[in-house]
Amino acid sequence: MPPTINMGIPGASSSVTGGVSGKRVLLAEPRGYCAGVDRAVETVERALEKHGAPVYVRHEIVHNRYVVDTLAKAGAVFVEQTDEVPEGAIVVFSAHGVAPTVHVEAAARNLKTIDATCPLVTKVHNEAKRFARDDYDILLVGHEGHEEVVGTAGEAPDHVQVVDNPDAVDKVTVRDPDKVIWLSQTTLSVDETMETVRRLREKFPTLQDPPSDDICYATQNRQVAVKAMAPECELVIVVGSKNSSNSVRLVEVALGAGSDAAHLVDYAEDIDPTWLDGVTTVGVTSGASVPEVLVRGVLDRLAEYGYGTVQPVTTANETLVFALPREIRPARS
């Protein structure tokens, strides 16, 4: 096994050059499932074990095609709206969170709800509620229409404005420039978010920061790992679905950090052999909603093309685990 290339950890080296000639893969670590996704997927699995099929899930539990298809085969039924769930049935809310109106709709239909919202998303919801109570204008940096943004904005619709990107700052107006705070979607590009905030602060100099980082640890860690390996890569392959915000951001980060090309794939079969023409070093990573089996498939496919040497590039070690929703926790013995 080639040596692990550590970066960002005490005693780590500061270069990804591993001294290996010929074709190779640099494999980002950390990658794949974050604690919130792991919790959400296990929530649906446990609900199916406890209650049997069907278990309804509002929106995709996480933004990954393979995960959704696998759970659907096991008996999960994915719906877009609460009124698609039969009265009295079990419904799981996705990791992205929902607006308070959705809880009201569910109660009106006598639904048995299991909330799989990521605790880090819940934190942003609570911040929105808190600052709305204090009558702040809340500038929510995030992608208009994304489920997480819809849910967070729904906590305080009269106080929240969504700021989609740095160029959207020009259109932002507030009631009192001395009473403004920014919050963010948890899965954004750190660099683009900071550029948006920089422009907001130019416009509103007393803009307040969130009490703590809103962009989640896993999103940041995966972007840092890609930045570490991308300068050494002619190609970076990101395993993830097109509707996964954090996966799409990894493609952007790879290109911005120096990779000649970067592509998003759901499966190994999506790799176009022409991408590999003239390529010596391929970087591989995966979004926070991607199971490791899909990454292994990509590595196997690359090995078929001669990229059998795999060097991990480690920038962080993740140990965080979130407790399951109380409705499906195992009974204590």
Swiss-Prot record:
**Record's function text:** Catalyzes the conversion of 1-hydroxy-2-methyl-2-(E)-butenyl 4-diphosphate (HMBPP) into a mixture of isopentenyl diphosphate (IPP) and dimethylallyl diphosphate (DMAPP). Acts in the terminal step of the DOXP/MEP pathway for isoprenoid precursor biosynthesis.
In this chain, dimethylallyl diphosphate is annotated as bound at H63, H96, H146, S244, S245, N246, S289
- The question of whether Iron-sulfur is a record keyword is answered with yes
Source domain of life? Bacteria
Q: What is the lineage of its organism?
A: Bacteria, Bacillati, Actinomycetota, Actinomycetes, Mycobacteriales
Similarity comment: family membership: Belongs to the IspH family.
- Pathway as given in its UniProt record: Isoprenoid biosynthesis; dimethylallyl diphosphate biosynthesis; dimethylallyl diphosphate from (2E)-4-hydroxy-3-methylbutenyl diphosphate: step 1/1; Isoprenoid biosynthesis; isopentenyl diphosphate biosynthesis via DXP pathway; isopentenyl diphosphate from 1-deoxy-D-xylulose 5-phosphate: step 6/6
Question: From which organism does this entry originate?
Answer: Mycobacterium sp. (strain JLS)
Residues holding isopentenyl diphosphate: H63, H96, H146, S244, S245, N246, S289
Which residues are annotated as active site? E148 (proton donor)
GO biological process: what's one of them?
Answer: terpenoid biosynthetic process
Q: Which cofactor does it need?
A: [4Fe-4S] cluster
On whether Cell membrane is a keyword of this UniProt record, the answer is: no
Q: Which reaction does it catalyse?
A: isopentenyl diphosphate + 2 oxidized [2Fe-2S]-[ferredoxin] + H2O = (2E)-4-hydroxy-3-methylbut-2-enyl diphosphate + 2 reduced [2Fe-2S]-[ferredoxin] + 2 H(+); dimethylallyl diphosphate + 2 oxidized [2Fe-2S]-[ferredoxin] + H2O = (2E)-4-hydroxy-3-methylbut-2-enyl diphosphate + 2 reduced [2Fe-2S]-[ferredoxin] + 2 H(+)
The protein's name: 4-hydroxy-3-methylbut-2-enyl diphosphate reductase
Citing just one GO molecular function, the answer is: 4 iron, 4 sulfur cluster binding
EC number(s) recorded for this UniProt protein: 1.17.7.4
- Annotated positions binding (2E)-4-hydroxy-3-methylbut-2-enyl diphosphate: H63, H96, H146, T186, S244, S245, N246, S289
Major enzyme class:
oxidoreductase
Q: How is the cofactor bound?
A: Binds 1 [4Fe-4S] cluster per subunit.
A Pfam family (short name) is LYTB
Keyword annotations from UniProtKB, A to Z: 4Fe-4S, Iron, Iron-sulfur, Isoprene biosynthesis, Metal-binding, Oxidoreductase
